[in-house]
């Protein structure tokens, strides 16, 4: 249609259309091109609006106020059941170690960990994060008596959280998600309800953080020491130095498969597969580029569906405590109905003077679950709702482009019709003038030769008479 309109404009501007037609053609060309381009831009704008989704937050009753968190839906490439980068840890044990550069060690108030695994062990250490030497802060994901649990210490006491209902050493594929905010923690295995942990002395941390902003910097250390003496729970994981995967160094080597590890914005297994300079691999560790195999066909399907929740999109936001209470007991509905929306947020830069090194904000991630079977989400969680109105932009763009094309076509037809009528009248007038001119000229031309002949005849006759 665009080429047809250009040809119409060219016809309007041709010399056969006269001066009026040429001006109309030039005017048509001036308007056709920008209007058509604007229509195409309208279509593009409408199509681009499809990627936007409305974000809704559901806040339930919880102990702490939750800071709004931006959520983005995982792209299609991450929702196809792919388990991400997978490593097999064979008999004898192996280890993958990531070390932060000395000048880039983060101190965080909140941490996010997600990983998929399959094993038959009753005792093993999957992942451990340690602070710099001498500080003593750590976070450890482990298997104890066939149950998954996390233990961490951020400067006060060891805090432990465990899922005692789920059996995870059955050789099937499982996904575990852990979040920490200060001394609070949540843990979820597959589609089981979220477990919470609120240590003693941690009820007023948010108000304390606000009040500490008004305390002079030189007095911050004194206040922290006083609070520590009073049993106050500290909240900062200081100067994180290493991430150790496999547990060989802790004397409890892991045997099985680990997939899609994510910790505070770092996809460590992906980095290991890409030969990152900060990663070292030792022992019996082998890279596998496929979804983890399992003992049965049922567990294979479970692996592919469950891993849909382990791939993570990142965004930088501020995160406070966002926890959920225990829900109902798990149902027997398939895991394939779990959500594939993963929530990621950066850990807030601590205002706590507990930090030993200067704080640098670091990114973190939170796997945000919903209830199985399509029921309402857990309190305090957030859910992405894709509304049908997301196609409104595309519809508006297409309608606008179609309207512009129709107007341009009508305008071109109108100018083309006027050009035809004008050329007819002009040609008729020109023919009349030329015919009259030709008739007058013919009469004159006919008269002039006859007079010349008569003059010559008279002269000849006179000569003849003269000589005779």
From Swiss-Prot:
Post-translational modification Phosphoserine, affected residues: 450-451, 454
GO molecular function, one term: metal ion binding
Annotated segments matching region Disordered: 350-381, 435-468
GO cellular component: axonal growth cone; cell surface; endocytic vesicle; endoplasmic reticulum; excitatory synapse; GABA-ergic synapse; glutamatergic synapse; inhibitory synapse
Span of domain Laminin G-like: 87-285
A Pfam short name: Syndecan
Segments of this protein annotated with the region Essential for interaction with CBLN1: 201-230
Chief location: membrane
Domain of life: Eukaryota
Binding site for Ca(2+): 137, 154, 236, 238
Signal peptide positions on this chain: 1-46
Job of this protein: Neuronal cell surface protein involved in cell recognition and cell adhesion by forming intracellular junctions through binding to neuroligins. Plays a role in formation of synaptic junctions. Functions as part of a trans-synaptic complex by binding to cerebellins and postsynaptic GRID1. This interaction helps regulate the activity of NMDA and AMPA receptors at hippocampal synapses without affecting synapse formation. NRXN1B-CBLN2-GRID1 complex transduce presynaptic signals into postsynaptic NMDAR response.
Annotated protein name in UniProt: Neurexin-1-beta
Species of origin: Mus musculus (Mouse)
Gene: Nrxn1
């Amino acid at each position: 249609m665009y080429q047809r309109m250009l040809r119409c404009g060219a016809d309007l501007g041709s010399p056969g259309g006269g001066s009026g037609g040429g001006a109309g053609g030039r005017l048509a060309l001036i308007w056709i091109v920008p209007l058509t381009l604007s229509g195409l831009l309208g279509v593009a704008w409408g199509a681009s609006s499809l990627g936007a989704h409305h974000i809704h937050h559901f806040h339930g009753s919880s102990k702490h106020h939750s800071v709004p968190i931006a959520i983005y839906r995982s792209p299609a490439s991450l929702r196809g059941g792919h388990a991400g980068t997978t490593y097999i840890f064979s008999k004898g044990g192996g280890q993958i170690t990531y070390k932060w550069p000395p000048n880039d060690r983060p101190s965080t108030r909140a941490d996010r960990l997600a990983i998929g695994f399959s094993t038959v062990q009753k005792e093993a250490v999957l992942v451990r994060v340690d602070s710099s030497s001498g500080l003593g802060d750590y976070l450890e994901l482990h298997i104890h008596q066939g149950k998954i649990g996390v233990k961490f210490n951020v400067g006060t006491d060891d805090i432990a959280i465990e899922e005692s209902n789920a059996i995870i050493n059955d050789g099937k594929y499982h996904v575990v998600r852990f979040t920490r905010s200060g001394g609070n923690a949540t843990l979820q295995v597959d589609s089981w309800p979220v477990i919470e942990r609120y240590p003693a002395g941690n009820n007023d941390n948010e108000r304390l953080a606000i009040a500490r902003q008004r305390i002079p910097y030189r007095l911050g250390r004194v206040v922290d020491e006083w609070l520590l003496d009073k049993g106050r729970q500290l909240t900062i994981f200081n100067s994180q130095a290493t991430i150790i995967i496999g547990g060989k160094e802790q004397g409890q080597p892991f045997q099985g498969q680990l997939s899609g590890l994510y910790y505070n914005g770092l996809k460590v297994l992906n980095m290991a597969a890409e030969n990152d300079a900060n990663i070292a691999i030792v022992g019996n560790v082998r890279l596998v580029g496929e979804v983890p195999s399992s003992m049965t066909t049922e567990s294979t399907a479970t692996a592919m569906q469950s891993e849909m929740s382990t791939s993570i999109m990142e965004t930088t936001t501020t995160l406070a405590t966002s926890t959920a209470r225990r829900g109902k007991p798990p149902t027997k509905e398939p895991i394939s109905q779990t959500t594939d929306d993963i929530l990621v947020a950066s850990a807030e830069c601590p205002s706590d003077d507990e930090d030993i090194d200067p704080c640098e904000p670091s990114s973190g991630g939170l796997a945000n679950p919903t209830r199985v079977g399509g029921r309402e989400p857990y309190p305090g969680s957030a859910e992405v709702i894709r509304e049908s109105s997301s196609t409104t932009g595309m519809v508006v763009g297409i309608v606008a482009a179609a309207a512009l094309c129709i107007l341009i076509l009508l305008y071109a037809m109108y100018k083309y019709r006027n050009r035809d009528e004008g050329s007819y009248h002009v040609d008729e007038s020109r023919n009349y003038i030329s015919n009259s001119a030709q008739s007058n000229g013919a009469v004159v031309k006919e008269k002039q030769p006859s007079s010349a002949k008569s003059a010559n005849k008279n002269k000849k006759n006179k000569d003849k008479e003269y000589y005779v």
